[in-house]
């Protein structure tokens, strides 16, 4: 009986931790380093669908959805940031254009694959 209860609790903990790590919401901003390098060592390309996130592994693909208009785009994490309170992701101008915004916007994030 205790084994079943323990297994059920472990399964619930795994499901809860996975679901909470899979989604995030907050403010997205647009950034471009002007040809510099990202934290992953890549050259910044404002025409690519890439982004900066504080903790997701480099190479993670994230669906970003603009909460204002419902548009979404899949970006690849290749940099670190944003380092401004309340912001959850920095997007290249190409990704921001695909989402239909400039400046700041409220977004939902969902990990597509790591």
Q: Residue spans of the language-model regions?
A:
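Secreted/periplasmic proteins
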Residues: 2-114
